[in-house]
Amino acid sequence: MQQNQRIRIRLKAFDHRLIDQSTSEIVETAKRTGAQVRGPIPLPTHKEKFTVLISPHVNKDARDQYEIRTHKRLIDIVEPTEKTVDALMRLDLAAGVDVQISLG
């Protein structure tokens, strides 16, 4: 790969255990192939709250509240080798994790 190349990986998941497991797999794979890793950097958790009326008609005071938390992590791989890219492409991550990869 070119000099001063870097791979930025952003991970999103609802379950923090899944995202931590996936992050550790990516970091281990990158370090094993000789790349320099920065991170994982925990980004702010997005909390989305929903309020639902329990009663179908009256009793406006009776409500339930639900919340969805989206956990995010950022990993920078500095000066990746060809081995690093191949190993990351073959890596199988959990189904509940959204992965965005950008080259910079």
Swiss-Prot record:
GO terms for cellular component: ribonucleoprotein complex; ribosome. Pfam families: Ribosomal_S10. It comes from the Bacteria. GO terms for molecular function: structural constituent of ribosome; tRNA binding. InterPro entries: Ribosomal_uS10, Ribosomal_uS10_CS, Ribosomal_uS10_dom, Ribosomal_uS10_dom_sf. GO terms for biological process: translation. Keywords: Ribonucleoprotein, Ribosomal protein. Involved in the binding of tRNA to the ribosomes. Belongs to the universal ribosomal protein uS10 family. Part of the 30S ribosomal subunit. NCBIfam families: PRK00596.1, rpsJ_bact. This is Small ribosomal subunit protein uS10. It comes from Buchnera aphidicola subsp. Baizongia pistaciae (strain Bp). The gene is rpsJ.
